[in-house]
């Protein structure tokens, strides 16, 4: 994937417009989870070290375009950066130009307040572009959306490049999907086959084995001829599951953990996959299955992980995901993980430092895995050619 990288550019004295992902949760004017800001700080430091005049912006929440309310403001992000030692200020009225002093960071107010942002109005893209000498796209999480601050500005800025976060994300995904070290194992969890169908289809052409979990696994279990009781599954997609299983190595669990109701207090019973009763629901894989899958992961050279294999939020149905998580953490494989539930499992089991790369983009991660072109990356590639 050939894009210009910010790390390769001379930015001394240049006006640099960074599109970051600072869409963080805020409560009572305070940032409650700072992961995205922390991920962006090295990019801001690098731009300052290179002598750039630094502007940074992001979306926050879902404001109505053209209508500003204090809840939509990036002020809590500015306060956070001030506390982190940066010389930083917020600029609300910036579309007709902004002065940036040496060594300061100017945060441009929430882009989604600007009329035309979401529909990628070229006039707005040109206004963003006029603010800078170099546009830096560093928000992988919004790369699957063609908007004025992710696409339009990149079309019209004198130079458009990928920031360190975006470049690292593209490198890691490329390593896992374009030319993976083999065997390559993909783990796809989630409640429905329908929501991950394109992911499964795309991975079936790349992966040597696909491990399915959650409600998705239930559909494969049913397609293999087993009773799934009251489990969440999609009867209409059993033919699709059969076809995928016929053409790809997708191991079906040999044992499962079942409960009589979907609740944190429900008792868990472990049993063979062919012994599930009509009033039971499958909420996790059993120990034998988990150990078999852990062995597959142990022998892998590349692991792509998207989704848990059971209802890990409930302690009684956590063990399958825990065993799989530790197998990935202890593996020598190049591992890449993405998706909200996956990140929650990584946090729960404390294995973040043992995953080779953790993707920051939910929807963008899935679309990349599906083989779709990400508009914000496509325009950077186009600009790199010119």
Curated annotation (Swiss-Prot):
GO terms for molecular function: ADP binding; ATP binding; phosphoglycerate kinase activity. Substrate binds at residues 21-23, 36, 59-62, 112, 145. Pfam families: PGK. The keyword Transmembrane helix does not apply. The keyword Cell membrane does not apply. It catalyses: (2R)-3-phosphoglycerate + ATP = (2R)-3-phospho-glyceroyl phosphate + ADP. HAMAP family: Phosphoglyc_kinase. This is Phosphoglycerate kinase.
């Amino acid at each position: 994937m050939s894009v210009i990288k910010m790390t390769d550019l001379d930015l001394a004295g240049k006006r640099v417009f960074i599109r970051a992902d600072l869409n963080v949760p805020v409560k009572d004017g305070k940032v409650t989870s700072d992961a995205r800001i922390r991920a962006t700080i090295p990019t801001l430091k690098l731009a300052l070290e290179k002598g750039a005049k630094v502007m940074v912006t992001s979306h926050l929440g879902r404001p109505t375009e053209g209508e500003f309310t204090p809840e939509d403001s990036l002020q809590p992000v500015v306060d956070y950066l001030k506390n982190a030692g940066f010389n930083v200020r917020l600029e609300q009225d910036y579309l007709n130009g902004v002065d940036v002093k040496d060594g300061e960071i100017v945060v441009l107010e929430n882009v989604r307040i600007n009329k035309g942002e979401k529909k990628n109005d070229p006039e707005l893209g040109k206004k963003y572009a006029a603010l800078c000498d170099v546009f830096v796209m560093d928000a992988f999480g919004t790369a699957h959306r063609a908007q004025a601050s992710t696409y339009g500005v990149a079309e019209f800025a004198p130079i458009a490049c990928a920031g360190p976060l975006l470049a690292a994300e593209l490198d890691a995904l490329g390593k896992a999907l374009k030319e993976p070290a083999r065997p390559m194992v993909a783990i796809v969890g989630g409640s429905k086959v329908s929501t991950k169908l394109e992911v499964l289809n795309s991975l079936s052409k790349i992966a040597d084995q696909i491990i399915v979990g959650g409600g998705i696994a239930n559909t494969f279990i049913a397609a293999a001829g087993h009773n799934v009781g009251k489990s969440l599954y999609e009867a209409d997609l059993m033919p699709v599951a059969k076809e995928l299983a016929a053409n790809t190595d997708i191991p079906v669990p040999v044992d499962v953990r079942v409960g009589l109701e979907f609740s944190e207090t429900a008792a868990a019973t472990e049993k063979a996959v062919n012994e599930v009763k009509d009033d039971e629901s499958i909420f996790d894989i059993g120990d034998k299955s988990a150990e078999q899958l852990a062995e597959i992961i142990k022998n892998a050279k590349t692991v792509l992980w998207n989704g848990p294999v059971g209802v890990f939020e409930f302690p009684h149905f956590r063990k399958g995901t825990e065993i799989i998580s530790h197998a990935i953490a202890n593996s020598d494989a190049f591992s890449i993980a993405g998706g909200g539930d996956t990140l929650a499992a990584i946090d729960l089991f404390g294995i973040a430092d043992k995953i080779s790369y953790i993707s920051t983009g939910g929807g963008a991660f899935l679309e990349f895995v599906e083989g779709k072109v990400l508009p914000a990356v496509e325009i950077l590639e186009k600009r790199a050619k010119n």
